[in-house]
């Protein structure tokens, strides 16, 4: 007897390849060394490239509004944006993005086959018992390795923990632009209504 599996809940991760008009403006900016992030780091790089910032907001808004939430009039903005560089090949520790709704990572420069994929941890894996599956499926996987190629941008919910493994460094530095997004304007309903335009009076 075959038991039907119902995909009750899914976690959307959006992926699209962008052209040179998105990639080239970022290549002249120095990134943050992956393990030297501090309060002096530049977390607002897109404020220096307002046209690109507008394009990315428009791209994300179309994705989240038309394909995920079906809320065509909801507005969003990018809060923080920063370029990271890994010149040593050291692994990136697992983390998520606080004070953010969605996030993205954009591989705007050359990618080497040695560069490891970004891996997302499955937040729905039960704690305690661990029966190891013999075959990995969407129903039992503990992590998901996102695709990695030049020009690719990945949109994901900010609560997802993610990391990448260590690798042997090459002349091609692993670079990416990270962005955080939040909804703005009015959203919600009833006593859960929020209008960001009134927060500061």
Question: Across the structure, where does each feature detected by a protein language model lie?
Answer:
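Short, solvent-exposed loop/turn segments at secondary-structure junctions
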Residues: 21, 111, 125, 160-162, ...
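A short hydrophobic beta-strand segment most commonly corresponding to one strand
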Residues: 103-106, 171-187
